[in-house]
C-alpha cells in the first residue's frame, strides 16, 4: 500500500482519538481495512468534538485526504464497499485479539504484548460503532478488555502479580481513559473496574511496544488465530504451532427444522439481519474459525425458520 501523506500535529481537543489513529498507523500494512475504519472512526468522532477551530479543521481536512486515498487504494474491497462485510471483518479481528489476550490472561502469562492486545481490542470495538450501536456482548468485551489492560499494566508496573481470569467482569462501572493511571497505587486485592483506573499506553516507557507482533496462533484457543491472516509478501520465521484438530461443530437445534415456514412472516429487517449473520459466518471461515461460523449460521437459520433470534 502506498504511503499516506502525514497528518499535522494532533490538536489537544482530539486527544481522545490519538490511540485510534495510532492503531490505524500500526495496521496500514498489516490490515488496511482495519486501518481505514480506525481513521473513519477518528474522523467521525473528531467532527463531533470540534470542526470549527482552524487547527481542528486543518487536521480533519488532512485526515479526510488520508481516508479518500485509502478508499481509492482499497478499490472494490467488499469490506470497504459493503458495511455488513466491513463490520464482520472488524468484529472478527477484534474478537481474535481479545481471545488471544484473554487466553494469555487465564493461563497466567502476563506481558506487554497481552496488555496491548486487550487495549487494542477495546479500541477496535470503539471503531465498530461506525456501523451503528454495539451489541451487548461487544459492550461487555470492550469494558472488560480496557479494565484488564489497566489492571495488569498497573500490577506489573508496581511489581505485583495480577490475578488471572475474569475478575470483576460483572461490575457496572465504565472504564474511561485517564492520563494519571501510572500514579494510581493498587490495593492488595484486584480492583474492580472503575473510572479512576484506565490503561493508557502512552504512560509506558518510550518504545515499550515498538515492533510488537502477536505470534500467529501462539497460545490462542483452537481455530482462533491471534493475528488475523494478512498478505504482506514477507515470509515469517516465527515457529508455527502444530496443527490443531478442528472441534466438532455444535449440534443444530432440532427445533429449527420443525418450525413451519408458512406460519411466520419475515420483515425486510429480518432478511437483512439473516444476511448479516451469513456474512459474519463467511468472514469467520476466512480465519478457519468454525465455531463462530456455525454460531452465526445457526442464528440466521433460527431467524429464517422461526422469525425470532
Swiss-Prot record:
- GO biological processes: late endosome to vacuole transport via multivesicular body sorting pathway; protein transport
Region span, Interaction with IST1: 2-186
| Cellular localization per UniProt | Cytoplasm; Endosome membrane
> Which residue ranges does the record annotate as region Interaction with VPS4B?
198-309
Q: Where is this region: Interaction with CHMP5?
A: 2-75
Q: Which InterPro entries match?
A: Vta1-like (IPR044538), Vta1/CALS_N (IPR039431), Vta1/CALS_N_sf (IPR023175), Vta1_C (IPR041212)
An example GO CC term for this entry is:
endosome membrane
Q: What membrane topology is annotated for this entry?
A: Peripheral membrane protein
Report keywords, A-Z: Acetylation, Cytoplasm, Endosome, Membrane, Protein transport, Transport
One Pfam family assigned to this protein is Vta1
What tissues has this protein been observed in? Widely expressed. Expressed in brain, liver, kidney, spleen, lung and heart (at protein level).
- Region: Disordered, residue numbers: 173-254
Q: Carries keyword Transport?
A: yes
Q: Where is the composition biased (Polar residues)?
A: 232-245
Superkingdom: Eukaryota
Described purpose of this protein according to its UniProt entry: Involved in the endosomal multivesicular bodies (MVB) pathway. MVBs contain intraluminal vesicles (ILVs) that are generated by invagination and scission from the limiting membrane of the endosome and mostly are delivered to lysosomes enabling degradation of membrane proteins, such as stimulated growth factor receptors, lysosomal enzymes and lipids. Thought to be a cofactor of VPS4A/B, which catalyzes disassembles membrane-associated ESCRT-III assemblies. Involved in the sorting and down-regulation of EGFR.
Describe, as the record does, how this protein assembles with itself and its partners: Interacts with VPS4B. Interacts with CHMP1B. Interacts with CHMP2A; the interaction probably involves the open conformation of (polymerized) CHMP2A. Interacts with CHMP3. Interacts with CHMP5; the interaction involves soluble CHMP5. Interacts with IST1.
The UniProt entry's sequence similarity note says: Belongs to the VTA1 family.
Name used for this protein in its record = Vacuolar protein sorting-associated protein VTA1 homolog
Q: What is the originating organism of this protein?
A: Mus musculus
Gene designation per UniProt: Vta1
